[in-house]
């Protein structure tokens, strides 16, 4: 069976808003990554960018199960000797709550140029306000 190649001029990129309030982080990230890739569309093609723009609001109120709030750590490396820095989820949530969602979604996208391009279509905001009202986004319910 041949891979279906949709015409570029036919594709319409919709804008979706997903409220992360009370949503489990991993389940939310699956829904967001599928929308970014376009896996819920009949024109899905693995090597093409066919997804929609996704705006995630209330990222600071996302939920992690178990004791991941204190046990899970994020590591960053400055490039210098002894430059490893470990932060817990609670520390990341206090300073940059949108990075929790970004990190989870990035891990579910392809590890190539297509994944980098898809990630630019994700907009995450810690509160309920977002500057994308002019794009007339459709509110998508969190299915978790």
Region roles according to the model:
Residues 1-103, 113, 131-144:
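Ribosome large-subunit tunnel/peptidyl-transferase-proximal elements
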Residues 102, 109-131:
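C-terminal structural segments of small proteins and small subunits
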């Amino acid at each position: 069976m041949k891979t279906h190649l949709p015409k570029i001029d036919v594709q319409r990129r919709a804008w979706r808003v997903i409220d992360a309030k009370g949503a489990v982080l991993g389940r939310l990230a699956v829904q967001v990554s599928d929308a970014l890739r376009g896996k819920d569309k009949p024109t899905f093609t693995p090597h093409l960018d066919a997804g929609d723009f996704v705006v995630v609001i209330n990222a600071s109120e996302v939920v992690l199960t178990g004791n991941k709030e204190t046990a899970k750590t994020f590591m960053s490396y400055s490039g210098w000797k002894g430059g490893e820095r470990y932060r817990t989820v609670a520390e990341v949530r206090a300073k940059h709550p949108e990075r929790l969602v970004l990190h989870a979604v990035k891990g579910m996208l392809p590890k190539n140029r297509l994944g980098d391009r898809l990630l630019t279509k994700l907009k995450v905001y810690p509160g309920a306000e977002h500057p994308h009202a002019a794009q007339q986004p459709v509110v998508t319910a969190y299915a978790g």
